[in-house]
Amino acid sequence: MDKYEFNIKVEQIKKMVNKEDFATAMKIADTIDWRRVRNANLLSTISQVYEKNEQYQEAKEVLLLAFERAPIGKRFLYKLTELALKEGSIREAEDYYQEFCELAPEDTRQYILRYLILKEKRASQDQLIQALERYINAELDEKWMYELAELYAKAGRNDA
């Protein structure tokens, strides 16, 4: 495929993504060898296309390519952790989580990743609460505050 044809396909994919037609975007994406693409942001977009179509393995493979192109991308590690969890690969998610923590030890999102991993492992309510409390103590985020309140209710605690 020459550069002109590639650029046309990429533009088509972007149009489909903007229309939220991820199925068509994926059909176009399937015709491209993403290993030859160097643009990490484009690879990230393609990963999202596969994720929206619940093709988590493909999403992960493309996102790994993006991470190779931009190894300082903690955003990619965060997303790789999420994708591994969606795929049910807890061990792999923990590996990405560890890399994320090493790369960005001050990033409070590590507590969210920890919570998501614990949740996937079916950890105790107290462990889940502790992970979310650490995040909420650092960041005030309504979504996660609500989740924490639900955990308190399930655990029969009135801390909320």
What are these regions (language model features)?
Residues 25, 59, 93, 127-128, ...:
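Single-residue signature of alpha-solenoid repeat helices
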Residues 37, 71, 105-106, 139-140:
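Short coil turns that delineate tetratricopeptide repeat
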Residues 5-35, 45, 51-52:
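Alpha-helical segment of the N-proximal tetratricopeptide repeat
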Residues 20, 54, 88, 122-123, ...:
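Residue-level detector of the short coil/turn that links helix A to helix B
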Residues 16, 50, 84, 118-119, ...:
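Residue at a conserved register position within TPR or TPR-like alpha-solenoid repeats
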Residues 45, 79, 113-114, 147:
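Canonical tetratricopeptide repeat
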Residues 31-34, 64-68, 99-102, 133-137:
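Conserved structural position within tetratricopeptide repeats
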